Every structure is written in structure tokens, then in C-alpha cells.
Amino acid sequence: GGGTNLQAIIDGIEQKTITNTEIAVVISNNPGAYALERAKKHGIEAVCISPKEYESRAAFNEDFLRRLDAYEVDLVVLAGFLVVIPEQMIAKYRNRIINIHPSLIPSFCGTGYYGLKVHEGALARGVKVTGATVHFVDEGTDTGPIILQKAVEVQEGDTPEILQRRVMEQAEWKIMPQAIDLIANGKVTVTGKTVHISK
């Protein structure tokens, strides 16, 4: 919704900390997503495509993939896109779809862990360290090969909202642009579940 990870990517491209990269299109399933506004402000094409507008999930999946193919993208970046990615898209874009998750996978991830629920889970368990993970997307939920992780300390008195903000500022907004830059410059290879990063 808010598009803060998108803004971090836009800033990274403008400041040249992300190189060899341009944003072809921003797609949201939520017509009210501020990410669409952010994209338009920077002259980036913004598209809303929602499963609710289709008679079946299969029809949505087919159109979504067709529209994505039309942009001829090399990399698909998910940031708060809560629609299940069609399996045919995962197969076609194998190790070319990345997602950011606001915990250190394999903790507090998988079905049901999204948004504030992740940080509520971390605080309820009493962990001292949490963070964020950028990973390739596979057929599972948060199960794909891990590209980058960054740890963030949990502090006394944290609320889910405070912790969410700290994880965004200290981890998400740093490692998502970093991962894109590494991939765009051919420094990332995947063997099975393991990502190798060349210097």
C-alpha cells in the first residue's frame, strides 16, 4: 500500500546506488495504493490489476502473466503484494521474482505472517533480534532461496508499530535496493536453495 519499499528503490536508482536498472512498470492489486501515486510522480507507468475484476482466479492469472510479459521485465520485485503469485508465473520467471519479508526467515514467516502480524509474532515470542529478508519467490510462502538478510535489535518497550518502522528503516529499505543492484549486475547465482554472491 504505502509504497515505501518502492520509494527506496526509486531513490536508489536516482542516487545511483542501484545501477543498470530501470523500473518498467509498477503493478498493484489495490487501486488506492499510494505506490501507484509514487510511480506516477516519477514518470513510471502504474497499473492496477485486481483478482476481484475477473470471473475466476485462472482468468486473473492468465491476464496478469500476459500483461507482465508485455513489459519484457528481467526482474519482478514484490513489496507488499499480497496476491498469491500464479504457479505458471513462478515457473516462467524462476529466480527472477524477489520478495521482501520483515523477519529473519525462517522465523515468523509463511502463511498468516504479513504486515504487523510478523512483528506481533516476534514480540510475543520475546526474540531479541529480528530483521528483514530478501528472497527469490518459489511455490511456497517465504520458502525461496535467501539473497540478503539484515538483523535489527528488538528494544524494551517496542510495540508492533515501532518495531515495524525500525525494521523498515534499518533493514528493508537497505537490503531490497542492494539485492536489486546485485542481481542487475550479474552478481547473484542460485544453486538449489543457496544463493551465491560474487564480489
Put a short name on every predicted segment.
Residues 2-199:
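One-carbon transfer enzymes
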